[in-house]
Amino acid sequence: FKADFTRSLGRFGIIISLAIFILCMALGLITGIQLVTVFIFVGIVAGVVYSLSPFRLRQTIYKPLVNVSVGAVPVLIVASFFNIFSFQLLVLVLLIGLSTAANSLWEDLADYESDFTSKARTLVVVLGFKRGFLITVLVGYCLVPLMVLVGILFQLSLLYFIVLGTLIAFLSFRLIQHRNTLFRS
């Protein structure tokens, strides 16, 4: 239904898309800050190559890489607007971008059946569900040092580290608890 509706928009859909693009670029230009406009443009381009043919990267192995921009670009737009660039901010941008990519892998696990049936070439379909799951878990654990670094760089309270440690312990416990179901051949 949704695809049929989108197709039926035809030229009107293209006009709406161009109007929104022009509005977004105009808002970027109004700020008078070139980097804001550049990051808005990058975000729009990433969205287009993610969704539209001939690229349609959402159905490819590159989907998590494109999703890095989904998390990182909004933070970069705000940072550009306030002209705040620092090592701390870049680490935060990296964490948010990589977290968005990791979330993309989790979504691919949930969509495995439909992606496999529709012959999408996502990372999870290419590697298989079990390997895709293991990669996703590994990526999640690799984000932990970055989360700790962000906590240190931004001088977050002890509560942040307690909550982070509790979440890691809980998720690790659940993985161990269900290892036979999750990791059986």
Predicted segments with their positions:
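Multi-pass alpha-helical membrane architecture of UbiA-family
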Residues: 1-185
